[in-house]
Amino acid sequence: MKKIVTIIAIVLAIAVGDLALTYNNFIVNSDYFVKNDFEITQYKHPEKVWDKVFFGNSVVISAYMEDKSSKGYVNLGLDYGVVTDLWEMIEKKHINIGSELVIGLNYLTLYDEFETNPTYIWHKKLYEPYVYFERDRFYPMITDGFDKLLNGESPLPYKYLPQEKHIYHGAMSDKMLEKTMENYQDEFFNLPTEKFSKNVAALEKIINYCND
């Protein structure tokens, strides 16, 4: 009986520790990792509740200049961001929104097969240990630290400062813009509605959440 109690206690301790790592923003608060767009947003806005939020993909990152705006919205633009990302952030309580939510929508933010950034924390499975989920970032830092230590160097990793979201600069002529739109129309505009069903369903959940 004591062995069973001990095993249960160990399992619970591991589960609680993993949960703490998941939600304590360990990587967000460290300068030794390259942060993704969500982590950069968290780093700039450590407050528990974001009163006004502007969500979208890279279009929002580039178009809404938070530091030059007086509107007070948190720029939650994410590279490869889709509506299901926003819903998972809300549902899994990775963000808390106060009074306003603005969503920048286009066909890519609603496209179910659009590739995503696998390091976003809401992609972590419930049964997946945090250290394993972040293995691609932890492993190189640990092995590099050991190599430096063996060579008599300081094992401290390189600091990645400062870190900003990538902004896509550039301009197109009318002809180039027209050609680009034609390409997008050929690739996306005639897709069946099933290709957007998951994100549309997530949008409905977000609307219901806001209405509540």
Walk through the language-model features, giving the residues of each.
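Secreted/periplasmic serine-hydrolase-like ester/acetyl group-modifying domain
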Residues: L105, F114-Y209
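Extended hydrophobic/aromatic segments used for targeting, binding, or gating
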Residues: A13, I207-D212
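Alpha-helical transmembrane signal-anchor/signal-peptide segments
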Residues: Y23-P46
